[in-house]
A protein has these predicted regions:
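Membrane-interfacial hairpin junctions
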Residues: 57-69
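Membrane-proximal soluble regions of multi-pass membrane proteins
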Residues: 2-26, 88-133
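Hydrophobic alpha-helical membrane-embedded segments
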Residues: 45-48, 68-98
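Cytosolic-side membrane-entry/anchor segment at the start of a transmembrane helix
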Residues: 6-59
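Loop-to-transmembrane boundary segments
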Residues: 31-42, 119-150
């Protein structure tokens, strides 16, 4: 059996990057059941709301208008869940592009900086399957959430 000699460091191979973010803490949230995922986003919103309320209370205008204070605090505290979603989106899009690519761009210290290595056909097929059946649904789910937040 021919063993493929790959110059790409293990940590920079798309399949290993996929496994790495799949096991990371915040980036892996979209892999959870939807109700657990939404609950985590809700908890992040609830966590930051008191901090936002304290910051908003520093305004003389808002201190005298309680309804405005609450509305602005609740709205501004949405920043944390949106940042978390953005981070997840960027990570999954990056992995999706790396898995779909025919070549692997990698960096290695020394004289191999900025190298490109063409994936063998069997690697490409495996990466495409992972991209289409595991990563694409996550991206679509995050896209749906972003579209909902725009309303």
């Amino acid at each position: 059996m021919n063993k493929i000699i790959c110059p790409v460091p293990l940590s920079q191979r798309p399949i290993n990057e996929f496994n790495s973010i799949r096991n990371s803490w915040i980036i892996s949230w979209p892999l959870l059941e939807k109700n657990i995922f939404y609950r985590k986003l809700l908890y992040s919103w609830i966590f930051i709301t008191p901090i936002s309320l304290i910051i908003s209370y520093g305004s003389d205008y808002l201190r005298n208008n309680i309804l405005d204070l609450i509305l602005i605090s609740l709205t501004s505290s949405l920043l944390l869940p949106i940042l978390l979603l953005t981070r997840q989106w960027l990570s999954w899009i990056y992995i999706y592009k790396r898995l779909n690519s025919e070549n692997i761009e990698y960096e290695e210290s020394g004289w191999y900086d900025g190298q490109v290595w063409e994936k063998p056909i069997d690697w490409r097929a495996k990466d495409l399957l992972i991209a289409q059946h595991q990563v694409k649904p996550i991206i679509n789910h995050l896209k749906t959430i972003f579209m909902t937040l725009q309303l």
